Design a protein with these regions (language model features):
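Acidic active-site catalytic centers that drive phospho-/nucleotidyl reactions
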Residues: 13, 107-109
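Conserved active-site tyrosine of GNAT-family acetyltransferases
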Residues: 17-21, 83, 110
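Vicinal oxygen chelate
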Residues: 1-5, 27-72, 77-106, 117-120
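Amphipathic alpha-helical segments
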Residues: 13-28
Length: 120
């Protein structure tokens, strides 16, 4: 079976999003052009940023979705504070939900990035 190993987000400004994700991931893009940038999000997993106006076939307004990062519970509050200090909009402050402790930040295009610790 094929593995799920590449996520592409449609973005308004590739350069702005590239800078955001380089800072968030702590590494430079593997490749970059005016219309596309690609990162290694984790070993074997790539994150692409594609200029929305260049996408073929043209994409309509996408449905809701999230990128998720799992961290130890002790890192939730400090990570949320560090993101807020960098100017990342926090859509959900650290909160305990049914699935665990979580917070949500937004990238420059409003894509949700959920950081959480699974319950249990």
């Amino acid at each position: 079976m094929s593995q799920f190993n590449f996520v592409i987000l449609y973005v308004a400004d590739v350069s702005k999003s590239q800078a955001f994700y380089a800072d968030l991931l702590g590494r430079p893009a593997l490749e970059a052009s005016p219309g596309f940038a690609m990162f290694e999000a984790a070993p074997g997993v790539r994150l692409g940023l594609w200029k929305a106006s260049d996408v073929k076939p043209a994409a309509g307004r996408p449905g809701g979705g999230e990128l998720c990062i799992v961290v130890p519970e002790a890192e939730i509050a400090p990570t949320a504070a560090a993101w807020a200090a960098k100017g990342i909009e926090i859509a959900l402050a650290p909160t305990r939900l049914d699935f665990g402790l979580t917070f949500v930040g937004l990238d420059p295009d409003g894509h949700r990035i959920r950081v959480f610790t699974p319950a249990g």
